[in-house]
From Swiss-Prot:
Gene: Pak1
Post-translational modification: Autophosphorylated in trans, meaning that in a dimer, one kinase molecule phosphorylates the other one. Activated by autophosphorylation at Thr-422 in response to a conformation change, triggered by interaction with GTP-bound CDC42 or RAC1. Activated by phosphorylation at Thr-422 by PDPK1. Phosphorylated by JAK2 in response to PRL; this increases PAK1 kinase activity. Phosphorylated at Ser-21 by PKB/AKT; this reduces interaction with NCK1 and association with focal adhesion sites. Activated by phosphorylation at Thr-422 by BRSK2.
Keywords: Acetylation, Allosteric enzyme, Apoptosis, ATP-binding, Cell junction, Cell membrane, Cell projection, Chromosome, Cytoplasm, Cytoskeleton, Exocytosis, Kinase, Membrane, Nucleotide-binding, Nucleus, Phosphoprotein, Serine/threonine-protein kinase, Transferase
Top EC group: transferase
Reactions accelerated catalytically: L-seryl-[protein] + ATP = O-phospho-L-seryl-[protein] + ADP + H(+); L-threonyl-[protein] + ATP = O-phospho-L-threonyl-[protein] + ADP + H(+)
Residue stretches of biased makeup (Polar residues): 150-166, 219-230
Organism field: Rattus norvegicus
Annotated stretches, region: GTPase-binding: 75-105
Primary location recorded for the protein, binned into one broad class: cytoplasm
Protein's recorded name: Serine/threonine-protein kinase PAK 1
Domain Protein kinase, chain residue ranges per copy: 269-520
Residue ranges of every copy of the CRIB domain listed in the record: 75-88
Length: 544
């Protein structure tokens, strides 16, 4: 990674700026901003059953690493609980039957047309259940681990679809369901943040309507007397894990004492400056007295942390996974009832500011993609899936350095977004296999990287201004999103995007493979990002 700064004497021309900011709240009704949703929907891509299955575990971690396994609490496999929802779909009338009332209300306001519902009722139910599961899951993030020893784990969860004559048959799909509290859910994607005066961002998208809880159950639908053919029977069986006894507060404190550093952080760090405040803690920048390094410190009141057990796991994992392209965990301390976590600090802000305020050329985009792929190759080789790749989670140094953040415990270093606990962020960057609740692996990060590359081209991801549920539907059914002006891109860049945004997971490139792609060979030095960072910071300052 290059850290070369610009020669102050060679003043480059001002970087190209976007004419208007593309950041629009979710409530925007301007039809001119709907760039992606109006195109006709292609046929639902044929789903190929994956050979490799990734079993996801929060606390058990990578079972191939015995040392980590010993240090992390274990969670049992799902067992002895079955929850069934029966929903019917009449392909003649195009109406769902037996749908929970809250789901029906959500669907009514989703902007998913009747013809779209009739074309793919399965996708409609997939996104409704996905949205519902994210509404009920805890908003705190944690890393996902792939477990090679469990690739052949077969869940008994199935989704069976029977169709009437007017609708082509959809094959049964086997999927891995998640427990809201203990199993690793797909990532909850935060909404596009507003500009703020620091690298830390806050939510702007309003909370969505209330969805039905996971425990909503309906009776199986009986065929109505006046129907000549029964409605489609869409039956979802879900399992829930048995809960293991949680660690007591004293046990958690005892474990934390064995992990954190001994000593007074107020003597090691000086020049504290508050830069963020959240429900669970306060974020400061500070200076390491010994090295002069600027750091970010989050001070968290442990009594206000809903999942204290996860904190232990994340510190252990962060301590063991360090990389030049990751915003790294540096240290931690117990100060009274507070846990202080020290992380690297990057003063350049997030990539979001750059993509929304300036125009990047292909060489600069290639440089960012290369740095992100280096971080992903490292994480994936250590059986860690980031699950939340987007411009908001890429931080920049003033020298142009590019680092991935907001994975694992890094999620806790950002001030909590005020609405995150009461809403589900729209997953613009999320891979189709996640939205449709299939088993997934590290390549979900590659899809998200492809969407982030579109951000760098167009200033925003596809479907940003769509209703959240419709955005989910389009991700599940549209396949690879279309670019606004694909003819303006080079052939090698288009090929790189196609490799990232391949619907067939087995054909999608891995981080290791994509690091060899020809597109990355045109990458400019990282110092070429410095003028863009400076221009974005100036534009952000002028907007307030």
């Amino acid at each position: 990674m290059s850290n070369n700064g610009l020669d102050v004497q060679d003043k480059p021309p001002a970087p190209p700026m976007r004419n208007t900011s593309t950041m629009i709240g979710a409530g925007s009704k301007d039809p001119g901003t709907l760039n992606h949703g109006s195109k006709p929907l292609p046929p639902n891509p044929e789903e190929k059953k994956k050979k490799d299955r990734f079993y996801r575990s929060i606390l058990a971690g990578d079972k191939t690493n015995k040392k980590k396994e010993k240090e992390r609490p274990e969670i049992s496999l799902p067992s002895d609980f079955e929850h069934t929802i029966h929903v019917g779909f009449d392909a003649v009338t195009g109406e769902f039957t037996g749908m929970p009332e809250q789901w029906a209300r959500l669907l009514q306001t989703s902007n998913i047309t009747k013809s779209e519902q009739k074309k793919n009722p399965q996708a409609v139910l997939d996104v409704l259940e996905f949205y519902n599961s994210k509404k009920t899951s805890n908003s705190q993030k944690y890393m996902s681990f792939t477990d090679k020893s469990a690739e052949d784990y077969n869940s008994s969860n199935t989704l069976n679809v029977k169709t009437v004559s007017e609708t082509p048959a959809v094959p049964p799909v086997s999927e891995d369901e998640d427990d809201d509290d203990d199993a690793t859910p797909p990532p909850v994607i935060a909404p596009r943040p507003e500009h703020t005066k620091s690298v830390y961002t806050r939510s702007v998208i309003e909370p969505l309507p209330v969805t039905p809880t996971r425990d909503v159950a309906t009776s199986p639908i009986s065929p109505t007397e006046n129907n000549t053919t029964p409605p489609d029977a869409l039956t979802r069986n879900t399992e829930k894990q048995k809960k293991k006894p949680k660690m007591s507060d004293e046990e958690i404190l005892e474990k934390l004492r064995s992990i954190v550093s001994v000593g007074d952080p107020k003597k090691k760090y000086t020049r504290f400056e508050k830069i963020g405040q959240g429900a669970s803690g306060t974020v400061y920048t500070a200076m390491d007295v010994a090295t002069g390094q600027e750091v970010a410190i989050k001070q968290m009141n442990l009594q206000q942390q809903p999942k204290k057990e996860l904190i232990i796991n994340e510190i252990l994992v962060m301590r063991e996974n360090k990389n030049p392209n990751i915003v790294n965990y540096l240290d931690s301390y117990l100060v009274g009832d507070e846990l202080w976590v020290v992380m690297e600090y990057l003063a350049g802000g997030s990539l979001t500011d750059v993509v929304t305020e300036t125009c990047m050329d292909e060489g600069q985009i290639a440089a960012v993609c290369r740095e992100c792929l280096q971080a992903l190759e490292f994480l994936h080789s250590n059986q860690v899936i980031h699950r939340d790749i987007k411009s908001d989670n890429i931080l920049l140094g003033m020298d142009g350095s590019v680092k991935l953040t907001d994975f694992g415990f890094c999620a806790q270093i950002t001030p909590e977004q005020s609405k995150r606990s009461t809403m589900v962020g729209t997953p613009y960057w999320m891979a189709p296999e996640v939205v449709t609740r299939k088993a997934y692996g590290p390549k979900v990060d590659i899809w998200s990287l492809g969407i982030m590359a579109i951000e760098m081209i167009e200033g925003e991801p596809p479907y940003l201004n769509e209703n959240p549920l419709r955005a989910l539907y389009l991700i599940a059914t549209n396949g690879t999103p279309e670019l606004q002006n694909p003819e303006k891109l080079s052939a090698i860049f288009r090929d790189f995007l196609n490799r990232c945004l391949e619907m067939d997971v087995e054909k999608r490139g891995s981080a290791k493979e994509l690091l060899q792609h020809q597109f990355l060979k045109i990458a400019k030095p990282l110092s070429s990002l410095t003028p863009l960072i400076a221009a974005a910071k100036e534009a952000t300052k002028n907007n307030h």
